């Protein structure tokens, strides 16, 4: 069994009790501080060597080691680094070192314990407030957003609206609104709509009188509600606006005629812009146009699929050259182009009734088509067909026929009196004679006429629909540009 090695002491200077990391550094320290000649600054290796140097070179005697602590100035001791240190001093140094190490360990332990305590306290404090904060944060939202839905829809759980403001209220909230209409529909709708994000709906409801305003919404809603289209975003807004108008206007019987026109756009949220453009024209249109718009509106809300098909045809219409001419006439025609197709079907059937009526109707349809397009643009998309018919009528063949009757003034009056439909009536027979070559065009004209309902009567119905002429005035720029000839040139372009 080998002896336990004594713990090695860190190098330290016996003269000044200073510790060093390396013994080499210790020797350099001793040579510079303790064994240096104070006269010539020569560095010696031991105390006795310094004494001999001074005695021989400088003829001086040195009794003590310079820069040494009291009690360790003995110059006779030959110490070099850690060698030559007395044993008792070595033991004392070990003891001191052990004490220092113990003290340092205790301090470290205390520091560590203090740090742990601080960490624990900080962690505990941090953990405690965290749970409290979330609770407080959740409680206020429960109270604030929960309050509105609670009175409106007692069945709704208070927590769901705040947590899921967008979708949850819609899904569960809408059913309660339907049955809850009588008790507190207004509040329910306002809050649910506010959560859904339909801000417009809420103000509209607020504007409407307490009870009567909303009931109209409900009858209008069932057809639109089954498809989720109204909820998504803009469509609901347009519907809300339209509903508010009819709600107020439906009460007086007279305004109902104008009201139906806005309703179809509401049912067609897909094309709100077209609906808005159409609304002013409907006001200008006469009762006949209103009745037609009513029929169209009744068709439009239910046959949403038919409208979609019409829209599909619209692109085909875009390929059709009529679009080019329609822009020349006015920006409005492109919008109504889609509705024209739906009406065109009815018009085609009516046109088949009589070929003779078709030519006359087609001739008059030029102005009428524009009027119908402007009026119907709100509800349907017949502009494309109308433009085609007009363009075809404007073709050189058709115009040539007009002068042939010999009643050129009569042909011109329709152009000039676009505002007045009566003058064209006397010239209708002549135009009818010209129309025979235009039977196919008559079909297109029938489509246009189908919108206003002029198909059965051909020219006479067109005369009945003078109000339609004002909408056609939107097209007048063509006649003024060159009477019939310039329009014919446009048709030639087509």
UniProtKB/Swiss-Prot annotation:
Biased composition (Polar residues): 127-136, 323-332
Superkingdom classification of source: Eukaryota
Annotated region (Disordered), positions in chain: 100-161, 250-377, 455-494
Main location: nucleus
Biased composition (Acidic residues): 112-121
Biased composition (Low complexity): 283-300, 342-377
Zinc finger (C2H2-type): 11-34, 35-58
Name this polypeptide is given: BUB3-interacting and GLEBS motif-containing protein ZNF207
Species whose genome carries this gene: Pongo abelii (Sumatran orangutan)
Gene behind the chain: ZNF207
């Amino acid at each position: 069994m080998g002896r336990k090695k004594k713990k090695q002491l860190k190098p330290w200077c016996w003269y000044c009790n200073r510790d060093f990391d390396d013994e080499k550094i210790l020797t350099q320290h001793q040579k510079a501080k303790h064994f240096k000649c104070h006269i010539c600054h020569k560095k010696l290796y031991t105390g006795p060597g310094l004494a001999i140097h001074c005695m021989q070179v400088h003829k001086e005697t040195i009794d003590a080691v310079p820069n040494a602590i009291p009690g360790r100035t003995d110059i006779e001791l030959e110490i070099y680094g850690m060698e030559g240190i007395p044993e008792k001093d070595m033991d004392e140094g070990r003891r001191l070192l052990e004490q220092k190490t113990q003290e340092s360990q205790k301090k470290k332990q205390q520091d560590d314990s203090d740090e742990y305590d601080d960490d624990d306290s900080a962690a505990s404090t941090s953990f405690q407030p965290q749970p409290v904060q979330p609770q407080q944060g959740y409680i206020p939202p429960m109270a604030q957003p929960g309050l509105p839905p609670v009175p409106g829809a007692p069945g709704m759980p208070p927590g769901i609206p705040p947590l899921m403001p967008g979708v949850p209220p819609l899904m569960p909230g809408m059913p309660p609104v339907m049955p809850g209409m009588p008790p507190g529909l207004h509040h329910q709708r306002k809050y649910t709509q506010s959560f859904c994000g339909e801000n417009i709906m809420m103000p509209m409801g607020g504007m409407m009188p307490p009870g009567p305003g909303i009931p109209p919404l409900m009858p209008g809603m069932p057809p639109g509600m089954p498809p989720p289209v109204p909820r998504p975003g803009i469509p609901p807004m347009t519907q809300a606006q339209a509903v508010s108008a009819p709600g107020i206007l439906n009460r007086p019987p007279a305004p109902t005629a104008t009201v139906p026109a806005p309703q179809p756009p509401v049912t067609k949220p897909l094309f709100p812009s077209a609906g808005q453009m159409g609304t002013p024209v409907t006001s200008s249109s006469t009762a006949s146009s209103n009745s037609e718009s009513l029929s169209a509106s009744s068709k439009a809300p239910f046959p949403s699929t038919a409208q979609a098909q019409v829209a599909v045809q619209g692109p085909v219409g875009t390929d059709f050259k009529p679009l080019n001419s329609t822009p020349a006439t006015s920006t409005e025609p492109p919008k109504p182009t889609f509705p024209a197709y739906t009406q065109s079907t009815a018009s085609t059937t009516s046109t088949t009734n009589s070929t003779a009526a078709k030519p006359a109707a087609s001739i008059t349809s030029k102005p009428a088509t524009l009027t119908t397009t402007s009026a119907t643009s709100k509800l349907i998309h017949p502009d494309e067909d109308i433009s085609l018919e007009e363009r075809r009528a404007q073709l050189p063949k058709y115009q040539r026929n007009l002068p042939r009757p010999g009643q050129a003034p009569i042909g011109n009056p329709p152009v000039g009196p676009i505002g007045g439909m009566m003058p064209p009536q006397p010239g209708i027979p002549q135009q009818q004679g010209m129309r025979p070559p235009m039977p196919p065009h008559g079909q297109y004209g029938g489509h246009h006429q189908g919108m206003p309902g002029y198909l059965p009567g051909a020219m006479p119905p067109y005369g009945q629909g003078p109000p339609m002429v004002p909408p056609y005035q939107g097209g007048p720029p063509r006649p003024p540009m060159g009477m019939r000839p310039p329009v014919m040139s446009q048709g030639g372009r087509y």
